[in-house]
Amino acid sequence: MYHGMNPSNGDGFLEQQLQQQQPQSPQRLLAVILWFQLALCFGPAQLTGGFDDLNVCADPGVPENGFRTPSGGVFFESSVTRFHCQDGFRLKGSTKRLCMKHFNGTLGWVPSDKPVCIQEDCRIPQIEDAEIRNKTYRHGEKLVIDCHEGFKIRYPDLYNLVSLCRDDGTWDNLPICQGCLRPLASSNGYVNISEFQTSFPVGTVIAYRCFPGFKLEGSENLECLHNLIWSSSPPRCLALEVCPLPPMVSHGDFICHPRPCERYNHGTVVEFYCDPGYSLTSDYKYITCQYGEWFPSYQVYCIKSEQTWPSTHETLLTTWKIVAFTATSVLLVLLLVILARMFQTKFKAHFPPRGPPRSSSSDPDFVVVDGVPVMLPTYDEAVNGSSSALGPGYPASVGQGCPLPVDDQSPPAYPGSGDTDTGPGESETCDSTSGSSEMLQSLYSPPMCQGGSRPAPDTPDTISSTAGEVASTSPGIDIADEIPLMEEDP
């Protein structure tokens, strides 16, 4: 029975050594059984001498970065053990060891050197915020990495900007990808970054905030610059004075913003309100804590409200009052306009327009009708019914008679003599002026007599006598000299 591995694994040297020692005596087997029984009773420490007498090989050990099979037990003569290395390492020397007797009769391992696991290749380093280009690195090769955007490569040795793979599988002067280091934060404030992040790429902006009751002193925002330093020093949060309890209000209370009101720090706003049935005496109901004092500093009071809603009857009465007042105002304005108009009319009647009176003798007004000058009546004549329409010295014609000059009028010597005295020229003049006389008689009523009676209508005798007294147009009045009718062309 062997406490080890069976050496039949194809190793010629070990198989040859074992074949020479194949016969085993029964006495040796009994000795091993006896030794185990004594070890259970007295312990292995008291049987050291006996263990040496049994001729077993010492424990070969386990190489660093490796392991062996079997991992434990007692190794007697002809026992075999195997050694293995972890990934990335290789075993230096033989992987098998044989327990065999030397020439002096003692047992030992063949080969006798201790197994060693050496690193075959340099492992890929774990560099934060970097990408490794190659996957395997042999002895003497350089490490090639790319840092993430915003980070820069930094070497421990500033004079040796390269990292090489050593013989033992380790790296020399291993670099890192570095950004701006995490800045300090105030104990009374906070920043908008993760507590596990230690390096920040270029362009990162960190915002500082203070807890309520503290004021920020310094720059509020910090930026990571290209030289991997922050734009300014971290700010501080300084404690502010806390305002006292707001003034209490009878029949009311207050609420604060922001809530809850654990401390009345700088910037806290208090809003007052009254209980139902009460109202504030002032329209302004807010006060603000500013550097330990309330602003504005005034006392707030709540008084009982006495407001009553008007009834329907009172509302209608108020509406009618408004309508009546509006209608009365409109009527009064209209009455004033009418009175002003009447006063203006009477004023014009009593006070005629100013100006010098017209003189009919000095500056007569004439109208020429069919070549005959006709005097226009004055205002008084038109009102009183006067019909003196001819110019001075020309009496009004009656019926179909023609006007005659005053100087030339003479009663006929004999009745009916007007027919014989009238010349042909005078008859034509009478015919031409008869139309204008009829028009004037239609415009003006006949004048009243001095006694108040109308003149008697013209009789045929009168008409015939008047017709005979037709004035000649050639002598008497020079019409062209008195009134220019039309400017003739030369």
Swiss-Prot record:
Q: Which residues fall in a compositionally biased region of kind Polar residues?
A: 430-444, 461-475
Disordered as annotated region, ranges:
1-20, 394-490
**Cystines in this chain:** 57-99, 85-117, 122-165, 147-177, 180-224, 210-237, 243-289, 274-302
List the signal peptide residues. 1-41
- Record's subcellular location: Membrane
Q: Which residues lie on this side of the membrane: Extracellular?
A: 42-319
Supply the alphabetized keyword list: Disulfide bond, Glycoprotein, Membrane, Repeat, Signal, Sushi, Transmembrane, Transmembrane helix
Tell me which Gene Ontology terms the entry assigns under biological process: regulation of complement activation; regulation of postsynaptic neurotransmitter receptor internalization
A Pfam family matched by this chain, by name?
Answer: Sushi
Q: How does it sit in the membrane?
A: Single-pass type I membrane protein
**What name goes with this protein?**
Sushi domain-containing protein 4
Say which species the protein is native to: Mus musculus (Mouse)
